Amino acid sequence: MSDLPRIFRFINRTSLVAQIVVGLLAGALLALFLPGAAKSVALLGDLFVQALKAVAPVLVFVLVTSSLANHKRGQPTHIRPIIVLYALGTLSAAAVAVLASFLFPTSLTLVSEATDVIPPAGVGAVLNTLLFNIVDNPVRALLNGNFIGILAWAIGLGFAFRHAQDSTRRLIGDLSDGVTLIVKVVIRFAPLGVFGLVAGTLADSGFDVLLGYARLLLVLVGAMLFMALVMNPLIVFWQIRRNPYPLVFTCLRESGITAFFTRSSAANIPVNMQLCQRLGLHKDTYSVSIPLGATINMGGAAITITVLTLAAVNTLGIQVDVATAVLLSLLAAVCACGASGVAGGSLLLIPLACSLFGISNDLAMQVVAVGFIIGVVQDSAETALNSSTDVLFTAASCIAHGDIDEGAERRV
């Protein structure tokens, strides 16, 4: 018993990222040598993801309401420049995916049609879903994790509470601090969660099923890596005018790794919020930009939609000119921004992009089925890019406007 405090002190001294890497390796080894036991510990991963998903809507609602209610007059926030960066990043990702697909054309072995999913009818349907999400019932929005609706209600209440008594605003601030503390406790269990997620995933499917789609995966993941390590740093350099890579690697390490294994931008919101706090960013800014980014900053989704669509086009022998490729980039960027408003995310928006080339819905749904097969890697890499970019662009904008703690700025 006397060794327990020493063990806990050692765990507290060890960085969370190091603990997550240990959990990752342990999960892979367990799945390799004891697949039966690995399936059992998958429960740890499911519990961790569920805990993050449970706390994220409440965190966003309370934090945004508190930030706006307690906002001091004359204190600037920089949401608009961050939204511009989100749009620029998503459009750049679509363009990178088009270029990668032209340089490394890919063909698909189409599988049986995925009949249990229904894609949206068009871009109008996606926008319609987003608009109705804004005016959703607040209780239903919290229960279903509708972050567009949560943001709308939190912003409205935040502005309304600016006229409340000081004691009311302090209560909201205390509630925000309490929820933040709960989030920190949940995140401390990330190593166990990653251990369970890796062990369960490898024990269930392994990577044998992915070998047949190795070239497609290389193009997908390669485009995402190029976006994360080349394009995003260029955008950040344009903002902060100095070496962007320390900040880029911090965001990939602290946010991207967790997002890769949770495979949920919503579940990674608490992780991103805590990282923004450690980076010394302005709370009024990141409390809005991070949940907003989880909804509209979808560079990874734009890459997935574009690469799989052009793979289908190449498989069917359809010729693509430059003008159509540019149009596809724009369509993929718009579709990607609506990915969070569609059940199934980016994969179910592929038929929209395929319709640009006259590909029938039956064939497009076969492409979606291929996407589900490679989803273990595709969805993980996509979420890691999406979520880490939320923090990256928020931090870049704050640094560019001098809205960051100086000590934190020296660390990045």
From Swiss-Prot:
It is a multi-pass membrane protein. One of its GO terms (cellular component) is plasma membrane. It comes from the Bacteria. Its main location: membrane. The chain crosses the membrane at residues 16-36, 44-64, 82-102, 115-135, 141-161, 179-199, 217-237, 298-318, 330-350, 357-377. Keywords: Amino-acid transport, Cell inner membrane, Cell membrane, Membrane, Symport, Transmembrane, Transmembrane helix, Transport. It is found in: Cell inner membrane. GO terms for biological process: serine transport; threonine transport. It catalyses: L-serine(in) + Na(+)(in) = L-serine(out) + Na(+)(out); L-threonine(in) + Na(+)(in) = L-threonine(out) + Na(+)(out). HAMAP family: Ser_Thr_transp_SstT. This is Serine/threonine transporter SstT. The lineage of its organism: Bacteria, Pseudomonadati, Pseudomonadota, Gammaproteobacteria, Pseudomonadales. The gene is sstT.
